[in-house]
Amino acid sequence: MLVPLTDASARTCGGKAGALGDLLRAGLPVPDGWAVPLDVYRSAVRDASSASETRRNGPAAIADRPVPADVRAALADAVATLGGAPVVVRSSASDEDAHDGAAAGLYTSTLAVRGVDAVVASVRACWVSLHADPAVAYRAARRRDADPAMGVVVQRHVDADVSGVMFTPARPDGPTRIDASWGLGPSVVEGAVNPDAYTVGADGSVDAVTAEKRTRLDRRGDRLVTRVVPAPDRHRRVLDDTDARRLADLGRVVGAALGGAQDVEWAIADGQVWILQARPVTADLPPATPPSPTVRPAAGATVLTGAPGSRGTATGPARVVRDPGDFVHVRRGDVLVCPWTDPGWTPLLRVVGGVVTETGGVLSHAAIVARELGIPAVLGVPDATLLLGDASLVTVDGSAGTVTRAVG
C-alpha cells in the first residue's frame, strides 16, 4: 500500500518522491519516510467519482470523500513506527518537479503534522489540491497533462535552525546559488522573507549578500508559529563560508545523482544538513550581478531596486494586490505589485505583464513560476506597494532588478 521512500520512483509515486528515492539510494541525507503511490490516488478517485466528474467539479469531488480504510490503516502503521514524532506531508504529483515545469508551490504540503487523523487529512488535502484553480491554471498555461495523478510523501519532520533553497550549477565551472534564512523553509520558498543570498564559485569563493530577516517560522507542537527575529540576528549571516561551501558541495553531488542542475530545498538542524526535495531547474536565473538597466529613466522618474527574479522588461499600470479580494481589479497587462505572492495567486500570472514584490528571493516559488511563464519579476523591493501606488505607470526590468515609476 505505502512504498518506503528508498523504493520510490517517479513512475509509481510522482516526481518529488521519485527524486527523494534516488537520493536515498545514492546515500544522501534525506529524512526517512514513505510514499503514497499514484495508483492509490487513482483508485480512491475512481471509487469516489468518475474522472470526468473530478475534472468538472474539481476539489469538491474529493474533499468530502473519506480516505479508503486500507489507506488509513497503512498510514496509521507508518506513523506508529515514528513513535508519535511529527511528520511533513508533501505533494508528489505525476506532473510535478519535472524537466518541463516544476509546478512550484501549487500543490499542498503540510508541516508539523502529528497523529493519524491529521496525516490522513493532510493526504486528502494533497489530493484535493491537484484540482484547485491555481494548479488548473498552471497546467493550462504550460499545456501540461490535463489528467494528472497525485502521489504523497510522508516524512519525518525536520525542525530546522536554518533552511532555504539552492540552485546547483548547470556546468562544472558554474556557480551555486543559495537563498537562506532562519527557521523553517516556507519562509524562503513562499517569499515571506528577504533571505540572505550566497553565490559559491566552483573554486570555493563565496559572495554573500545579507538581508534583513525580520521573521522566522518554527514548529510549536503541531502548529507553525511566526516569530520575530531578535534584532542582533536580523542582519547576521545565517551561513558562514564553511556552511555555504558544504551546501554547494552537497548540491553538486545531488546534481550528479539526479542528472543536471537541480532546485534543492534543504535544512540544517543541530549541524546536520538535510535534503528535503530536489527537482530540475526549469528556467535560467538572471545573472547574480545584474546588468545596467535596459531602459534609461526619464528625468524625475522614481527608480526602485530589488532582486532580479525573472528576465525581461514590461511597462504597464501598477496594480496593488494585498489579498485575494483585490484580484477583481487586475487587468491584462497590469504590473502586479504586492507584499509577496501566494501559490494561490498563480492565475494572475497568466494575465499580468510583470511582478513586483516587497519580500522574497530569486529562488522562491513565485520567481520560479514567473521565469517559467516568461514574466519579468523584481523581488524584495522595500515598500513597493506604497511607493508605486495603484494605477501609476511603471516599467519592470527583471534582468537589472529595477522598477521605474514614470513622472506624473
Regions found by a protein language model. Name each.
Residues 175-176, 206, 273, 403:
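Hydrophobic "anchor" residues
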Residues 1-153, 160-162, 242, 255, ...:
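N-terminal beta-alpha lobe that positions the nucleotide/phosphoryl donor
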Residues 105, 256-284:
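Conserved metal-phosphate-binding beta-hairpin within the catalytic cores
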Residues 108, 156, 165-184, 278-283:
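Short beta-strand elements
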Residues 180-261:
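Conserved catalytic alpha/beta cores of large enzymes that bind or transform nucleotide phosphates
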Residues 280-285, 313-334, 339-408:
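Acidic, glycine-rich flexible loop/linker segments
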Residues 187-190, 282-293:
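A short, polar/charged loop-to-alpha-helix boundary motif
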